[in-house]
Amino acid sequence: MSARLVAIALGLLVLAGCTTTRQVAAPAAAVLVGAELDAAQARLAAREQALRAQPVIAFNGRVALARGREGGNGRIEWRQQGGEYRVTLSAPVTRQRWSLLGHADGRARIDGLEGGPREGADAESLVRDATGLEIPVGALADWAAGMRADPARFGPAMVEYDAAGQLLRLHQDGWTIDYTGWQVDAAGVAGGLPLRINAQRDDARVRLLVDAWQLGDAPETQ
């Protein structure tokens, strides 16, 4: 993937050129059995039920995207309302923005790319074809919130927990999602909400650092 494609993809976010991302060993999962496993599974199911009942799920924070030795980073805003989502990447220094609007049927539109808007029938394919980046946009909101994505679209998920029964890792659609930090006092959400998420499939990597979550009737950021 060329540096030019990365620049188009991230809307001139701060690029890392040929910088490699430092790899940190993932924590080992606990082997839970009996009542401990039942409690962990119940907590995950309760989180998913509480979050899917929310009319709006939104977060903002920082994101780093990489494929192989190429990558970049910037600010991210994500707003999910039903089956529709809008994700915006921005670079505060250059004041440039790159946004994706996705729909429940998979259709999507990218604004902010060189050459004007682009549309496609599948969000992941649109992003990949337009930018060369591999971003799991259809499932990322669920994974970021500590939920399994729709198995009808993304296949079954394998779940790993830590010794306290907290969600540690998800495996789904070829991606491995590690949870390394939590907001444990998130009101009404069993087990809290993730603050640090690392996702990887082959040489594609997405790292999220969430600054704030908004649930319910969260106003849309303009």
Residue ranges and their predicted role:
Residues 25-54:
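Post-signal peptide N-terminal segment of mature Sec-exported envelope proteins
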Residues 147-222:
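Gly/Pro-enriched, hydrophobic low-complexity segments
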